[in-house]
Amino acid sequence: MAYEDTLAAVDAVRLMDSVRAICTGERLSNEAEVRSFDVLEKLFTDAGCRVTREALPGYVSTPEGAAFEAGGIAYEVLTHPMTPSADGLEADLVYIPVDRTGSASAEEVSGRIVLTDGLAMEPVVRALEDRGAAGVVFITGEEIHNMIVSRVWGSPTPETLHDYVGIPVASLSFGDGTRLRARLAEAGGTLPARLSTRVESRWTEIPVITAEIRGADEDFVMVTGHVDSWGLGALDNASGNACAVELARILAPLASDMRRSVRFVLWSGHSHGRYAGSTAWCDAHFEELERHCLLNVNADCLGG
């Protein structure tokens, strides 16, 4: 099939219908995620693929709620996966610019909740924890961004358990953060604060769906992506899933002319497991990947 013919075969209406069908709710190892995998199984089957499903063990973490107040005023915050819960942590709040978090003295931050800038990132939390901080609150953009605060790639091993942070973490909006910084300055640099977070971290079975269009030999090209999502996740990553389905629909009628197979592999455990699903699947299929996988195209946030 010529490139122009492939483009002409793309059905934009069908693509959007697939996105809507996949967006059954926030997909974080819950019923909405199961529904999305059921939808994908039907879509790939209808496209003409051979479909299989697996469940692999993986460690995931979901934020369940957070509350934060400083100087008697409550602020809307989000907490983050792979951080500990905190039940009413009370401490003085101080502001440390993010470019000083690695050089701040223990005297400045020890026993305090630190307000700082940017996305909730593990290296920043680690630097402040090492200096004795009791918790960290990040000032993000106008919208509060979901982030996973971990350097552990995939599920933990005995060697990486110590790499998780040990203090609670939350984020608030840029507007609230700017106003809070002004209040801190007016108060002489500190305010009494209280931080509560609830994070559920657990081992679970991570679903993976594989849809294949068989070519003539055992070598294959992969198209991969994650199904789990923060919120409805239309862009991240129902769009990528829908494009995989549409590509399968276009390629399936050409199977008899294909030398190599095309394998579509979609998993959970990406956003809330820091790649636990993809890591577990690659471990389980390592020998086959090593011998026969020629190329992987990861479809994530397409159309953004």
What would you call each of these model-derived segments?
Residues 123, 205-208, 229-304:
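Acidic/histidine-rich catalytic neighborhood of metal-dependent amide-processing enzymes
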